[in-house]
Amino acid sequence: MKKILFLLVIVFGVNKTWAQGCSDAGICSINHGFQTAEKQFKNTIEVAAVYSLGEADVQYFSPYVSYTKRFNDRYSFTSKVTLSTAHGSFGTRTQLGDAFLIGNYSFKEKKNSQWSALLGFKFPFTASNLKINGYSLPLDYQSSLGTIDLFLGTNFHYRRWDFNAALQIPVINLNKNSYFKEYSGTDDFPSTNLFERKPDALWRASYSIKTPNKKITFKPNLLFIYHLGEDTYENIFSQRESIKGSDGLTVNGNWITTYYFNKQNSIELSAAVPFVVRDIRPDGLTRSFVLGILYQYSF
């Protein structure tokens, strides 16, 4: 119990600040692609809802549904669809976000350790140019970044530890955002006209703590996300311009608690806060706090 309390203090004992949250970019949440349900079940459905706080008091409600098919002990496939509602001073916007298709391969387990590899894609439902009453919106109000992305990842599991690394690479840019802060009357959000985003790299460490009856699992996570370059946009003179300070490191802490009703049904609560942030986050993924709930059913 002392170990659990100590980890809680580490994860949540921070001042309010801003960080890249686990939202549209997707790289924070693909670790579910490394996880598998009980091996006797071939199918898993997840239904989740996420509430988060963004920049300039923007609030988000982001439900999603996913389906995982296990073909055998080695191969599994996951599909996922997201929805996003953003509410703030610009108004309220609700729209489908992205579809994820992720394949996972698990290598043979050896001496309480196992490697797995992941390959996936993200497809947007919008070109990131949703408007309210005809007015262009910053990326903080968009449900997707409007890019087709490639995910490459690997995970090493040893006893109660998991270590995973991943890359998220935008391969096709469909972003048609037309927001200029010069015409918006506020400096809360940077200009992101025809936004082009650089890749992200992630490294995550997590540790699982199970109660004696194995009904509850606590899993603290530490995430290091490095944005590999400065994002760009097209300014009012039709010239491409780098967004200074948009590259660099983000460090997030995440605490997950899972309760198992039985082998087929479980519910998961998660909360995340930032420790280290980038100077500027034009992609609209700024979050001061993220709270999620997930129900999982396997059959």
Give the residues covered by each predicted segment.
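Outer-membrane beta-barrel biogenesis signature
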Residues: 18-46
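Outer membrane beta-barrel transmembrane domains
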Residues: 46, 190-299
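Transmembrane beta-strands of outer-membrane beta-barrel pores
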Residues: 49-55, 69, 81-87, 107, ...
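Outer-membrane beta-barrel translocator domains and adjoining extracellular loop/strand segments
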Residues: 58-63, 89-94, 128-136, 168, ...
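Residues that define the transmembrane beta-barrel architecture of outer-membrane proteins
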Residues: 59-63, 94-99, 113, 144-150, ...
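Transmembrane beta-barrel domains of outer membrane proteins
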Residues: 66-68, 104-106, 153-157, 164-166, ...
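Repeated loop/turn-to-beta-strand initiation elements of outer-membrane beta-barrel proteins
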Residues: 74-77, 110-115, 160-165, 213-218, ...
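Outer-membrane pore/translocation modules
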Residues: 93-195
